Protein backbone atom coordinates (compact mmCIF):
# COMPACT_ATOMS: atom_id res chain seq x y z
CA UNK A 1 0.00 0.00 0.00
CA UNK A 2 1.52 3.36 -1.04
CA UNK A 3 2.52 5.75 1.69
CA UNK A 4 0.08 8.62 2.26
CA UNK A 5 1.61 11.89 1.03
CA UNK A 6 2.49 14.37 3.76
CA UNK A 7 0.21 17.33 4.22
CA UNK A 8 1.52 20.86 3.74
CA UNK A 9 1.44 21.33 7.51
CA UNK A 10 3.45 18.14 8.08
CA UNK A 11 6.04 19.25 5.53
CA UNK A 12 6.41 22.65 7.20
CA UNK A 13 6.68 21.00 10.63
CA UNK A 14 9.45 18.74 9.35
CA UNK A 15 11.29 21.66 7.77
CA UNK A 16 10.99 23.49 11.07
CA UNK A 17 12.36 20.55 13.06
CA UNK A 18 15.36 20.38 10.74
CA UNK A 19 16.07 24.08 11.24
CA UNK A 20 15.66 23.84 15.02
CA UNK A 21 18.06 20.90 15.16
CA UNK A 22 20.59 22.65 12.94
CA UNK A 23 20.39 25.78 15.09
CA UNK A 24 21.15 23.75 18.21
CA UNK A 25 24.18 22.17 16.54
CA UNK A 26 25.51 25.56 15.41
CA UNK A 27 25.12 26.98 18.92
CA UNK A 28 26.77 23.96 20.54
CA UNK A 29 29.51 23.16 18.02
CA UNK A 30 29.79 26.05 15.57
CA UNK A 31 28.78 26.35 11.93
CA UNK A 32 31.92 24.59 10.67
CA UNK A 33 30.86 21.46 12.54
CA UNK A 34 27.34 21.48 11.13
CA UNK A 35 26.60 18.77 8.58
CA UNK A 36 23.52 17.28 7.00
CA UNK A 37 24.57 13.87 8.32
CA UNK A 38 24.78 15.22 11.87
CA UNK A 39 21.32 16.80 11.61
CA UNK A 40 19.92 13.52 10.31
CA UNK A 41 21.52 11.56 13.14
CA UNK A 42 19.94 13.78 15.78
CA UNK A 43 16.54 13.50 14.15
CA UNK A 44 16.83 9.75 13.67
CA UNK A 45 16.45 9.90 9.89
CA UNK A 46 18.73 9.42 6.89
CA UNK A 47 20.72 12.22 5.28
CA UNK A 48 18.64 11.64 2.15
CA UNK A 49 15.55 12.69 4.10
CA UNK A 50 17.17 16.03 4.96
CA UNK A 51 18.13 16.55 1.30
CA UNK A 52 14.46 16.19 0.39
CA UNK A 53 13.91 19.51 2.17
CA UNK A 54 17.18 21.42 1.89
CA UNK A 55 20.01 21.40 -0.64
CA UNK A 56 22.92 21.78 1.78
CA UNK A 57 23.97 23.28 5.10
CA UNK A 58 24.34 26.74 3.59
CA UNK A 59 20.68 26.80 2.61
CA UNK A 60 19.84 25.63 6.13
CA UNK A 61 21.95 28.43 7.61
CA UNK A 62 20.20 31.06 5.52
CA UNK A 63 16.75 29.65 6.24
CA UNK A 64 17.46 29.78 9.99
CA UNK A 65 18.46 33.43 9.61
CA UNK A 66 15.40 34.22 7.49
CA UNK A 67 13.19 32.57 10.08
CA UNK A 68 14.84 34.57 12.88
CA UNK A 69 14.45 37.92 11.15
CA UNK A 70 10.83 37.13 10.30
CA UNK A 71 10.20 36.44 13.99
CA UNK A 72 11.91 39.69 14.96
CA UNK A 73 10.04 41.76 12.36
CA UNK A 74 6.69 40.29 13.41
CA UNK A 75 7.41 41.10 17.06
CA UNK A 76 8.53 44.67 16.29
CA UNK A 77 5.47 45.44 14.18
CA UNK A 78 3.11 43.74 16.63
CA UNK A 79 4.35 45.91 19.51
CA UNK A 80 4.35 49.09 17.42
CA UNK A 81 0.92 48.56 15.81
CA UNK A 82 -1.28 49.93 18.64
CA UNK A 83 0.42 53.35 18.54
CA UNK A 84 0.09 56.26 16.13
CA UNK A 85 2.44 58.48 18.12
CA UNK A 86 5.99 58.04 16.82
CA UNK A 87 7.60 58.26 20.26
CA UNK A 88 5.37 55.54 21.70
CA UNK A 89 5.94 53.41 18.61
CA UNK A 90 9.73 53.74 18.98
CA UNK A 91 9.62 52.87 22.67
CA UNK A 92 7.51 49.79 21.91
CA UNK A 93 9.92 48.60 19.22
CA UNK A 94 12.96 49.05 21.46
CA UNK A 95 11.37 46.97 24.19
CA UNK A 96 10.28 44.39 21.62
CA UNK A 97 13.84 44.11 20.28
CA UNK A 98 15.20 43.52 23.77
CA UNK A 99 12.44 41.01 24.48
CA UNK A 100 13.33 39.11 21.33
CA UNK A 101 17.03 39.01 22.19
CA UNK A 102 16.48 37.83 25.75
CA UNK A 103 13.79 35.23 25.02
CA UNK A 104 15.36 33.86 21.81
CA UNK A 105 19.07 33.72 22.68
CA UNK A 106 19.93 31.02 20.13
CA UNK A 107 18.32 32.91 17.27
CA UNK A 108 19.87 36.16 18.48
CA UNK A 109 23.30 34.56 18.52
CA UNK A 110 23.12 33.24 14.97
CA UNK A 111 21.62 36.51 13.70
CA UNK A 112 24.02 38.90 15.44
CA UNK A 113 26.88 37.17 17.26
CA UNK A 114 28.16 33.97 15.69
CA UNK A 115 30.62 33.84 12.83
CA UNK A 116 28.33 32.18 10.30
CA UNK A 117 28.21 32.95 6.55
CA UNK A 118 26.14 35.97 5.57
CA UNK A 119 25.15 37.67 2.30
CA UNK A 120 28.61 38.87 1.26
CA UNK A 121 29.99 35.37 1.78
CA UNK A 122 27.54 34.02 -0.79
CA UNK A 123 27.95 36.65 -3.52
CA UNK A 124 28.80 34.91 -6.79
CA UNK A 125 27.50 31.52 -5.64
CA UNK A 126 24.38 29.59 -6.64
CA UNK A 127 22.81 30.46 -3.31
CA UNK A 128 23.28 34.24 -3.66
CA UNK A 129 19.55 34.87 -4.43
CA UNK A 130 18.51 33.21 -1.16
CA UNK A 131 21.23 35.12 0.69
CA UNK A 132 19.85 38.33 -0.81
CA UNK A 133 16.39 37.43 0.50
CA UNK A 134 17.87 36.86 3.95
CA UNK A 135 19.61 40.25 3.89
CA UNK A 136 16.42 42.02 2.80
CA UNK A 137 14.55 40.43 5.71
CA UNK A 138 17.21 41.71 8.07
CA UNK A 139 17.13 45.21 6.57
CA UNK A 140 13.35 45.36 7.00
CA UNK A 141 13.91 45.31 10.76
CA UNK A 142 16.58 48.00 10.51
CA UNK A 143 14.36 50.21 8.36
CA UNK A 144 11.62 50.22 11.00
CA UNK A 145 14.02 52.04 13.31
CA UNK A 146 15.39 54.24 10.53
CA UNK A 147 11.87 55.38 9.68
CA UNK A 148 10.93 56.03 13.31
CA UNK A 149 14.10 57.91 14.26
CA UNK A 150 14.19 59.68 10.90
CA UNK A 151 10.81 61.23 11.67
CA UNK A 152 12.58 63.54 14.13
CA UNK A 153 14.96 64.93 11.49
CA UNK A 154 13.62 67.98 9.60
CA UNK A 155 16.07 68.07 6.67
CA UNK A 156 16.17 65.68 3.70
CA UNK A 157 18.61 64.12 1.27
CA UNK A 158 21.87 62.21 1.69
CA UNK A 159 22.88 64.31 4.68
CA UNK A 160 19.79 63.11 6.55
CA UNK A 161 20.26 59.51 5.41
CA UNK A 162 23.84 59.37 6.71
CA UNK A 163 22.93 61.09 9.98
CA UNK A 164 19.96 58.82 10.70
CA UNK A 165 21.84 55.64 9.81
CA UNK A 166 24.68 56.65 12.12
CA UNK A 167 22.26 57.33 14.99
CA UNK A 168 20.40 54.05 14.45
CA UNK A 169 23.56 51.93 14.28
CA UNK A 170 24.98 53.68 17.35
CA UNK A 171 21.73 52.97 19.21
CA UNK A 172 21.72 49.39 17.92
CA UNK A 173 25.22 48.82 19.30
CA UNK A 174 23.98 49.89 22.75
CA UNK A 175 21.01 47.53 22.53
CA UNK A 176 23.26 44.72 21.36
CA UNK A 177 25.61 45.20 24.28
CA UNK A 178 22.74 45.05 26.76
CA UNK A 179 21.34 41.85 25.28
CA UNK A 180 24.67 40.09 24.77
CA UNK A 181 26.01 40.84 28.25
CA UNK A 182 22.73 39.65 29.76
CA UNK A 183 22.59 36.44 27.73
CA UNK A 184 26.22 35.64 28.51
CA UNK A 185 25.36 36.11 32.21
CA UNK A 186 28.24 38.52 32.69
CA UNK A 187 25.83 41.05 34.19
CA UNK A 188 24.89 38.42 36.76
CA UNK A 189 28.50 38.30 37.91
CA UNK A 190 28.62 42.01 38.79
CA UNK A 191 25.01 43.09 39.46
CA UNK A 192 22.71 42.06 42.30
CA UNK A 193 19.52 42.95 40.40
CA UNK A 194 19.95 42.39 36.67
CA UNK A 195 16.27 42.87 35.81
CA UNK A 196 16.16 46.31 37.45
CA UNK A 197 19.33 47.28 35.61
CA UNK A 198 17.85 46.18 32.27
CA UNK A 199 14.70 48.24 32.88
CA UNK A 200 16.70 51.32 33.88
CA UNK A 201 19.21 50.99 31.05
CA UNK A 202 16.40 50.50 28.54
CA UNK A 203 14.67 53.67 29.74
CA UNK A 204 17.96 55.58 29.58
CA UNK A 205 18.68 54.45 26.01
CA UNK A 206 15.18 55.35 24.86
CA UNK A 207 15.44 58.78 26.47
CA UNK A 208 18.81 59.39 24.82
CA UNK A 209 17.65 58.50 21.32
CA UNK A 210 14.49 60.57 21.65
CA UNK A 211 16.60 63.59 22.62
CA UNK A 212 17.75 63.66 19.03
CA UNK A 213 14.73 65.83 18.24
CA UNK A 214 16.09 68.51 20.58
CA UNK A 215 19.08 69.02 18.29
CA UNK A 216 16.91 70.55 15.60
What kind of region is each of these model predictions?
Residues 1-13, 83, 213-216:
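N-terminal intrinsically disordered/low-complexity leader segments
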Residues 11-22, 39, 64-72, 76:
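Generic hydrophobic, amphipathic alpha-helix propensity
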Residues 17, 25-59, 63:
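Helix-turn-helix
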Residues 91-121, 142-146, 172-177:
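Helical hydrophobic small-molecule/effector-binding pocket
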Residues 118-155, 165-169, 196-210:
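Amphipathic alpha-helical packing segments from all-alpha helical-bundle domains
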Amino acid sequence: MPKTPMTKEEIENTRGRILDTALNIIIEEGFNNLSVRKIASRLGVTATTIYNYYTNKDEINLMIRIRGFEKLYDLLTKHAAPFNDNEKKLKAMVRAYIEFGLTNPSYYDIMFNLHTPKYLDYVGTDIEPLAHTEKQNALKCLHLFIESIGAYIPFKGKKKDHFVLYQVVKFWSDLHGLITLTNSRLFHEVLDDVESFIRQRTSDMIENIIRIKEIF
